[in-house]
């Protein structure tokens, strides 16, 4: 029944029944990902974490292939040059290598996943599989953050913030480069993503405000982890 919305019209209605159903499944699977180690502590072994990281990378690859081969999307729009896939890949590399810098990148870059789940770029789709993979890969980003904080006791560092901001600026430069050549809008930095934003003119002012706002948001995300007067991390350690 729910799939008929997609099969009959090719349209994915935001906040429709299908949107709610797919998002709910993705949230439940992501919650299960976080909660399973309480029942099965052996899942926290390094080899199992590495397998999870590889599996998540394959999920992302599956999303790209499904989009281009089954859903009729242009490969130009499926390359992982947005912030969300960069965060997901960083999280996967953290699970594989356990290097804190990758967790820091995941943490500071994952906030876009919430917007993607609420306002998915699925206004036109042909396969329900793509919609499920899209929602699941985005829901896994905050789940990986919670998993790492809760089970692996990972923490954010000032150096991690600096690397995340610098990395984001490099991603923005990369997006501008490929947007010009492919006609895409990676990082939403070459075209207005929403009509309401067209009031911000000239366009370079929008670009400057957009980049500045995301850098400021990363700084805000760092505040719970800043050292206290006693030199301890301010975030409560569970």
UniProtKB/Swiss-Prot annotation:
This is Uncharacterized protein TP_0381. The lineage of its organism: Bacteria, Pseudomonadati, Spirochaetota, Spirochaetia, Spirochaetales. InterPro entries: CHP02206_TP0381. Pfam families: TMEM164. The chain crosses the membrane at residues 15-37, 50-69, 79-96, 101-118, 128-150, 163-183, 203-225. Keywords: Cell membrane, Membrane, Transmembrane, Transmembrane helix. It comes from Treponema pallidum (strain Nichols). It is a multi-pass membrane protein. GO terms for cellular component: plasma membrane.
């Amino acid at each position: 029944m729910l799939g008929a919305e997609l099969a009959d019209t090719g349209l994915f209605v935001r906040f429709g029944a299908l949107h709610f159903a797919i998002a709910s499944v993705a949230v439940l699977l992501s919650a299960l990902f976080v909660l399973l180690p309480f029942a099965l502590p052996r899942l926290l072994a390094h080899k199992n974490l590495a397998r999870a990281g590889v599996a998540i990378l394959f999920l992302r690859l599956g999303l790209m292939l499904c989009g281009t081969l089954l859903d009729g999307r242009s490969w130009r729009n499926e390359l992982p040059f947005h912030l969300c896939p960069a965060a997901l890949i960083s999280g996967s590399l953290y699970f594989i290598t356990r290097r804190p810098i990758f967790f820091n990148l995941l943490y500071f870059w994952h906030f876009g996943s919430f917007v993607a789940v609420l306002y998915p770029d699925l206004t036109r789709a042909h396969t329900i599989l793509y919609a499920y993979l899209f929602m699941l890969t985005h829901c896994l980003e905050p789940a990986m953050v919670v998993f790492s904080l809760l089970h692996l006791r990972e923490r954010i560092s000032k150096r991690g913030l600096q690397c995340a901001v610098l990395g984001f600026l490099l991603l923005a430069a990369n997006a501008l480069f490929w947007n010009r050549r492919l006609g895409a809008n990676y990082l939403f930095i070459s075209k207005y993503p929403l009509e309401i934003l067209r009031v911000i003119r000239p366009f370079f002012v929008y670009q400057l405000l957009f980049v500045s706002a995301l850098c400021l948001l990363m700084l805000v995300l760092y505040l719970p982890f800043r050292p206290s007067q006693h030199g301890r991390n301010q975030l409560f350690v569970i």
